[in-house]
Amino acid sequence: MKLHEYQAKEVFADAGIPTPESALATSVDEAVEVADALDYPVAVKAQVHVGGRGKAGGIKLAENTAEAREAAESILGMDLKGYTVDRVLVEEAVDFTNELYVGVTMDRSEGAPVVMVSERGGVDIESVAEEAPEDIVREHVDPSFGLQAYQARNAVYDAGIEQDVAGDVAKIVQGVYDLWADSDATEVEINPVMVTSERDVVAADAVMKLDEDALFRQPAFADMEEDAAEDDLEAKANEYGFDYVRLDGNTGIIGNGAGLVMTTLDLVDYYGGQPANFLDIGGGAKADRVANALDMVFSDENVDSVVFNIFGGITRGDEVAKGINSALEQFDEIPTPVVVRLAGTNAAEGREILNDDLVTVEETLEGAVQRAVEYADEEDIQ
């Protein structure tokens, strides 16, 4: 579960990590009211889960009331990379002299948490990692002991952070790690940490991703789950209990098991397509659950074809087939072509049940993916 910036900054503030003064607004008048209560200039920032908000027009600076109103009117309701902006964070703009990067995640190759610090903040850190990996200092942490103060200081000094702010940056590094560990997060990131003209340090942005499977022991985040959902599709996925990730492509993908779905995503890409989503219906899925999954994928207007990849173990092929038929029979006209690959338990029975007038059945996964990609390409041409 990824928190919005405003949610992450609330968590940061509670953890003692300095952030600019800010407040959330859901209307133009409310945004202006917040801006007037702060010290100008202010930044008006779209609250959507996309990168590059500034370049896409989702972040604007305002020097006065009129500009704050103009910025809010421009951002609220805009379509930002496929997402409608329905709320903005209004915060005091920071007069900065330098931008840094601080982040914590799990390094799976080392089997340990890793703290990352860089002087090159304010830019895409993935690009820095590719072009100049030496510019990112990495400090691995023994989770049995947690991040020690000397490790935080070493990371900051090794990154070349200016000495007069190094101590404050080290405190932020320590705070970010402690927050990552205490909240069962998969990633906590500040990009950038801004060094102000008065030589203070503040978290000008905030990224926080939580392990959804650990939310049962994180009651403090329970109230944030619904608001953290980006749109109706994510909210619907939460309601149905699906593991769902929306992507930027046009080939919808439904499978039973994370590994199977990931394999299907890779094959869609291999055959020249673009995955529209990750959707795992889980093991033992009954007909109604399959129907819900298909209805959800159809709800994404970017989807031009759908591929089912089902390998029956606990999940029976005949139950999946009934669910597909049930979902498709609700439509006077099928929104997009549907391709199905069934294998495993009761797969033969499932293929017999499937309505050939509604779906295309393929024997192999490769054949199913290629057919789905072809259908998506045809829809694009039309």
Swiss-Prot record:
Positions that bind Mg(2+): N191, D205
Top enzyme category: ligase
Pathway annotation from the record: Carbohydrate metabolism; tricarboxylic acid cycle; succinate from succinyl-CoA (ligase route): step 1/1
Domain of life: Archaea
Binding-site residues, substrate: N256, G313, I314, T315
Any GO CC annotation of this UniProt entry: succinate-CoA ligase complex
Cofactor note: Binds 1 Mg(2+) ion per subunit.
GO BP field: succinyl-CoA metabolic process; tricarboxylic acid cycle
Keywords: ATP-binding, Ligase, Magnesium, Metal-binding, Nucleotide-binding, Tricarboxylic acid cycle
Entry binding sites for ATP: K45, G52, R53, G54, E91, V94, E99
Domain (ATP-grasp) ranges: 9-236
InterPro entries: ATP-grasp, ATP-grasp_succ-CoA_synth-type, ATP_grasp_subdomain_1, Succ-CoA_synthase_bsu_CS, SUCC_ACL_C, Succ_CoA_ligase-like_bsu, Succinyl-CoA_synth-like
EC numbers on record: 6.2.1.5
Catalytic activity: succinate + ATP + CoA = succinyl-CoA + ADP + phosphate; GTP + succinate + CoA = succinyl-CoA + GDP + phosphate
Pfam families recorded: ATP-grasp_2, Ligase_CoA
Cofactor: Mg(2+)
One MF annotation (Gene Ontology) recorded for this entry: succinate-CoA ligase (ADP-forming) activity
Family per similarity comment: Belongs to the succinate/malate CoA ligase beta subunit family.
Assembly and oligomerization: Heterotetramer of two alpha and two beta subunits.
Function: Succinyl-CoA synthetase functions in the citric acid cycle (TCA), coupling the hydrolysis of succinyl-CoA to the synthesis of either ATP or GTP and thus represents the only step of substrate-level phosphorylation in the TCA. The beta subunit provides nucleotide specificity of the enzyme and binds the substrate succinate, while the binding sites for coenzyme A and phosphate are found in the alpha subunit.
Entry-linked NCBIfam families: PRK00696.1, sucCoAbeta
Protein name: Succinate--CoA ligase [ADP-forming] subunit beta
Gene name, Swiss-Prot/TrEMBL: sucC
